[in-house]
A protein has these predicted regions:
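A Rossmann-like FAD-binding core segment of flavoenzymes
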Residues: 72-81, 88, 96, 157-241
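FAD-binding core/adjacent interface of flavoenzyme oxidoreductases
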Residues: 3-5, 68-137, 213
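Rossmann-like NAD(P)H-binding beta-loop-alpha module
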Residues: 127-164
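C-terminal auxiliary extensions adjacent to catalytic cores
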Residues: 309-342
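Beta1/beta-strand and adjacent pyrophosphate-binding region of the FAD-binding site
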Residues: 1-10, 136-144
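FAD-site-proximal beta/loop scaffold in flavoenzymes
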Residues: 117-136, 198, 206-274, 281
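A conserved FAD-binding loop/helix module that cradles the flavin
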Residues: 257-308
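Beta1-alpha1 glycine-rich phosphate/pyrophosphate-binding loop at the start
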Residues: 2-72, 149-173
């Protein structure tokens, strides 16, 4: 009987757990390590912030889902992974050995600017939602679709919102919605420090806020960077087309924490879900000593971007659209995703 440890409960591992609930893997003893018994679905986070959903409507009960698939749920945070000794050590000091490990632990907000500890990082989502109280003046550092969605959601709740972006990585449609909803959008204006107050520093300018939210790009978890697994230049686990580590074949990785060596693609929930479908197939094959199936990511992914109110933008390659009907479409997709784990 093989010992399999699933580290983290991101999109890919949720797909794995759902598959195991439908068809358990009887010739393996499986454990899932996660700091939270319930996982907030990232696609519905802006809707929670805007007041359209209760948090409970956007959570997956991973402890119950694991139990249905005969997977042991182990609450805790990973402190160290030793892929040479095949052990996982938790912050509690507990050790667990494995024959196979799969990592889908997501990423952190990448912020190296001075004073970042005075800000509220958007990840992990569970801690972000528990700590956030929407005050009068909010600064959001880091654009991209995630930063824009959070800005418009918080603005919808009545706050004065300033969105700082070092580069213009969002579409003209999204920019128009930011302007329309009176978000103070400042592209090409990198934040150089966050001082007590908190004060946001951009060049020689200083502006005071009640809360600063960090929604900058993805950064790897420290224990993953220090694990000895081969990583890409940004510190994410390098995997081959079967989602196995290129340096340690007993380790799989998926979602934000992984980078495909030959076919790198953007880090988003859409790709992570596809990873999950390939991952469970290859975990079953690996336990059965069968050949693994290669995974090929799609060239383009659909992005559905909410705009605070019940209004959203759809983007897929060169095609885009917007309106209340896009929000309704996204709402149906998101609710169906949550229901699939009940």
């Amino acid at each position: 009987v093989k010992r399999v440890v699933l580290i983290g409960a991101g999109h890919a591992h949720l797909v794995v757990l759902r598959s195991l609930a439908e068809k358990p893997l009887y010739n393996a003893r499986i454990a899932l390590v996660s700091p939270h018994a319930k996982q907030v679905y990232s696609g519905m986070l802006p809707g929670i912030l805007a007041g359209h959903y209760r948090r409970a409507e956007a959570e997956v009960d991973i402890a119950t889902l694991a139990e249905r698939g005969q997977v042991e749920f182990v609450p805790g945070k990973v402190q160290r992974l030793d892929p040479d000794k095949k052990t996982v050590t938790l912050e509690s000091g507990a050790d667990s050995g494995y024959d196979l490990a799969s990592i889908n632990a997501g990423s952190l907000v990448g912020a190296s600017l001075p004073g970042a500890e005075r800000a509220l990082p958007v990840k992990p989502y569970e801690e972000f939602l528990s700590r956030l109280r929407i005050p009068e003046r909010v600064a959001i550092v880091g654009a991209g679709a995630a930063g824009a969605e959070i800005a418009m959601a918080v603005r919808h709740r009545g706050a004065q919102v300033t969105l700082y972006s070092e580069n213009a990585s969002i579409s003209a449609r999204v920019v128009r919605q930011l302007r329309r909803r009176k978000v103070d959008y400042r592209p090409g204006m990198p934040v150089t420090a966050i001082e007590p107050g908190p004060l946001v520093i951009t060049g020689l300018a200083r502006q005071e806020f009640d809360c600063v939210v960090l929604a900058t790009g993805a950064a790897p978890l420290p224990w993953l960077r220090q694990s000895g697994l081969r990583t890409c230049a940004r510190g994410f686990v390098l995997v081959d087309s079967t989602l196995r580590s290129v340096s340690h074949p007993e380790v799989f990785a998926a979602g934000d924490c992984a980078t495909l060596a030959d076919l790198p693609h953007p880090k988003s929930g859409v790709y992570a879900v596809r990873h999950g479908e390939a991952l469970i197939e290859n975990l079953r094959r690996r336990v059965a000593h069968a050949d693994l199936e290669p995974y090929a990511p799609q060239e383009k992914a659909l992005a559905l971007i909410t705009c605070g109110a019940r209004y959203a933008i759809a983007e897929h390659g060169e095609w885009s659209a917007q309106g209340w009907w896009v929000w309704w479409w996204k709402d149906r997709i998101d609710r169906r995703w949550i229901r699939s784990f009940l």
